Amino acid sequence: MSGDGHDGDEVLDELFEVIESRKEELPDGSYTASLFTHEKGENAVLEKLGEETTELLLAAKDDDDEELAHEAADIVYHLLVLLSMKDMELADLRAELRKRR
């Protein structure tokens, strides 16, 4: 673990802001925007979460730390997209995690 302090919070906040912005503006060529307009709707994100979870499990099984971090980041990203699709906030996730301390 690195000594980044609350940098992780800032990264998540910034990422969620970008996701929310893409949801509103739907810029051409944006992968994030394409998830909000996909013909499968939220099922596209749910499928992606399943795919990324499988890849994360394989990376863990193979003791591939670099790939594990990569796949974990993919899961977090797609989870944040799903929260946005459900009109939830990052604060909702944080509140639930605080309850579990």
Swiss-Prot record:
Gene3D superfamilies: MazG-like (1.10.287.1080)
Main location: cytoplasm
UniProt GO BP: L-histidine biosynthetic process
Domain of life according to the entry: Archaea
Catalytic function, reaction form: 1-(5-phospho-beta-D-ribosyl)-ATP + H2O = 1-(5-phospho-beta-D-ribosyl)-5'-AMP + diphosphate + H(+)
Pathway in which the depicted protein is active: Amino-acid biosynthesis; L-histidine biosynthesis; L-histidine from 5-phospho-alpha-D-ribose 1-diphosphate: step 2/9
GO CC terms: cytoplasm
Molecular function GO labels: ATP binding; phosphoribosyl-ATP diphosphatase activity
Pfam families named among the record's database cross-references: PRA-PH (PF01503)
Keywords per UniProt: Amino-acid biosynthesis, ATP-binding, Cytoplasm, Histidine biosynthesis, Hydrolase, Nucleotide-binding
SUPFAM superfamilies named among the record's database cross-references: all-alpha NTP pyrophosphatases
EC numbers: 3.6.1.31
UniProt subcellular location: Cytoplasm
Alphabetized PANTHER family for the sequence: HISTIDINE BIOSYNTHESIS BIFUNCTIONAL PROTEIN, HISTIDINE BIOSYNTHESIS BIFUNCTIONAL PROTEIN HISIE
Family: Belongs to the PRA-PH family.
Protein name, entry field: Phosphoribosyl-ATP pyrophosphatase
Gene name, Swiss-Prot/TrEMBL: hisE
